[in-house]
Amino acid sequence: ILQLISLILLPQQKKSYYLMGTYSYIEMPSADLNKKAYKILHDIETKLSDYIDSSEVSRINANAGKNFLKVSSITMEMIKKAIEVSEKSFGYFDITIGALTINAKRLKKIDEFRAKELVNFKDILIKGDSVMLKRENMAIDPGGIGKGFAIEMCYKKLNSKKGFISIGGDMKIWGHKRTIAVRDPRNGTSLVQMVNSKDVSISTSGNYLRKHIETPEDDVLQVTVAHEDGGFADAYSTAIFAMPEKMRRKFIEDNPDVGVLIVYKDGSIFINKRFMEFFEILLFKTNSEKQRRKN
């Protein structure tokens, strides 16, 4: 998980909030921008949260197999972005995992075997500004994309020259340089310290962080993605973590715009060239741990 270490001192307003089921941190040049950022994020949460019965996502789920539901441009953009990631990730990211995570595991409406049969992003039907899930008991779970997507939407709506937003394992830095760290998932210490060289969105996934991820049995502990877009960073980190190793490497090769840092159980790491392009400094905890690098 990512952790704030330090910041070049500039006039700013900092505040922590509880958003989207976790703690968030917003840092803006003024108190007004800070309040505006929170309001935008809260508004997005009321549309996308599957824990809010009146949200657009919850209403889509309630109408699965029955009716089309007219949705806002925000919800539509999130769904379309999720479908795009599903297509690029060979289906290892699938927002309709909600049949399993929501309807089977949380609400106990159906059994897990039936739920897995209902997971298929191709059964999301879009007609104009309306959405419907093709089969009853299908469900959208925005957990693998929602936080990063919300941060990105907030960044676009704020029109602020600089800022920092962090929600759980997702963050975006723009208009300034900042020292951040990737924690070692085995002991919570700092594994890599980094200073960004450009605006960047960062997302970290691991099954200890994100219970909505169905994972293969391999030696990956954690995946951190750096990308220009927060929604893509969030969804790609989810997808890459869920993939088996052979498919993971193919995806990374086929998508050079996605920066990837992978932590393995033996302490080794994998970093691709794109990840390093987002940072002017990368400092590793020790030289004793075996490292895997790809340039």
PLM ranges: what are they?
Residues 1-6:
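Bacterial N-terminal signal peptides
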Residues 7-295:
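Mature catalytic core of soluble alpha/beta enzymes
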